[in-house]
Amino acid sequence: MRQLGLKVKVRRAKYKAYKGEVGKISPNILNRNFKATAPNQKWVTDVTEFAVCDDKVYLSPIMDLYNREIVSYSISLSPNFWQTKEKLQGAISKLNKQDTPILHSDQGWQYQMKSYQKILQDNNIIQSMSRKGNCLDNACMENFFGRLKVEMFYGRTYTSVSNFVQALHEYIDYHNNKRISLKLKGMTPVQYRNHSI
């Protein structure tokens, strides 16, 4: 293989947020019903990890299932509660008074915390969780992560963490404002949301 200039890509171990039951597990209310008829009805969230320049970078977005828009996200060098809180507050700031979205996640430790669940309750957000070890229960977010990593991470070298973080910001802007989708009638996620208002 070396003589042909071929290299093997080895996948690193995936980040696992599940640390057992450290708090309350919510039922799977979303139950793989990924269709929403209006903005802010159904949101999904998760955390993914990137190894960049001997560091780890964690991305945690919230996606609206109505138009697949990333309504809020946070980037951190460690998976911590403040990252979860930051992205949640960003999403809450976009809610209308009458909105009561379902927010679906896996059973990661941060989603089991009382302080996280209190923020949801205080803002009329209904918590939903995937069954343990079942990534298909959050397939839309897993699909987003997979596409993101193929398009801007795998096979690329970043010279610094800050360059990579900038590339993440640019990718999410591209996803929301430039990437058209046949499922959205040839519009971008932001155009589709604006068209529905």
Question: What do these predicted regions represent?
Answer:
Residues 26, 40, 59, 80, ...:
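Hydrophobic (often cysteine-bearing) scaffold residues that line and stabilize catalytic clefts
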Residues 74-97:
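Active-site beta-loop-alpha junctions of metal-dependent nucleic acid enzymes
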Residues 114, 121-125, 147-197:
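C-terminal domain-tail junction helix/linker
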Residues 67-73, 127-130, 154-155:
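Short small-residue beta-strand/loop micro-motif enriched in glycine and branched aliphatics
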Residues 1-38, 134, 188-197:
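Basic, flexible linker segments flanking DNA-binding modules
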Residues 36-71, 77-81:
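An active-site-proximal beta-strand-loop segment
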Residues 19-21, 105-107, 113-114, 129-149, ...:
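RNase H-like two-metal-ion nuclease catalytic core shared by retroviral integrases
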Residues 1, 30, 46, 62, ...:
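Mobile genetic element proteins and their domesticated derivatives, centered on retroelements
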